[in-house]
Every structure is written in C-alpha cells, then in structure tokens.
Curated annotation (Swiss-Prot):
Name listed for the protein in its UniProt record: Large ribosomal subunit protein bL31B
Keywords assigned: Ribonucleoprotein, Ribosomal protein
PANTHER family, per the entry: 50S RIBOSOMAL PROTEIN L31, CHLOROPLASTIC, LARGE RIBOSOMAL SUBUNIT PROTEIN BL31C
Gene Ontology terms: cellular component: ribonucleoprotein complex; ribosome
InterPro entries per UniProt: Ribosomal_bL28/bL31-like_sf (IPR034704), Ribosomal_bL31 (IPR002150), Ribosomal_bL31_B (IPR027493), Ribosomal_bL31_sf (IPR042105)
Protein family membership: Belongs to the bacterial ribosomal protein bL31 family. Type B subfamily.
The keyword Ribosomal protein appears for this protein: yes
Annotated organism of origin: Tropheryma whipplei (strain Twist)
Record note on quaternary structure: Part of the 50S ribosomal subunit.
Length: 83
C-alpha cells in the first residue's frame, strides 16, 4: 500500500442513542467526543440514532418513532378517505 494516502484506522466507540448500547470497533471516523471504556482506555465516541441494538428488524420489536406527529396525520387522512 502507498503511504500517506489511506485514512488512519483506529478504535472508536459507537453509542446507540435509542438503546444506550455501546460498541467498541474500528473505523476511520474522527469524532471529537471521548469516553472511557471498560478496559480503562479512552476512545473517541460516535453517537448514532439507531443501530442493530435498537432497529426493529434486528430486535424483533416494532416501534413507531414519531417526533412530529406524522403518524397521527396519516391516520387522520386515511380515516377521511375511507369514510
């Protein structure tokens, strides 16, 4: 491999904001936040809104994430059309 053309590949902690699960893995991401991991070392922290720990496909639980009332708007519109 050529030197100085590849991004630095290091350890990063990914935190799922929906379930508060954390995963230590490797990535080329460079987040500014840091966290102390179980082994006592400090690693960069990257926060994600959803991961395999909270996604309905992987958990088998169906949840509706509705922060702006879109589901209620849909139900109201559907109810008007069906009557």
């Amino acid at each position: 491999m050529k030197s100085d053309i590849h991004p630095e590949y290091g350890y990063v902690v990914f935190k799922d904001l929906a379930s508060s699960e954390m995963f230590l893995t490797r990535s080329v991401l460079k987040p500014e936040k840091q966290i102390e991991w179980n082994d006592g070392n400090h690693y960069p922290l990257f926060e994600v809104e959803i991961s395999s720990a909270s996604h309905p496909f992987y958990t088998g639980q169906q949840r509706i994430l509705d922060s702006e009332g879109r589901v209620e708007k849909f139900y109201a519109r559907y109810k008007k059309q069906s009557q």
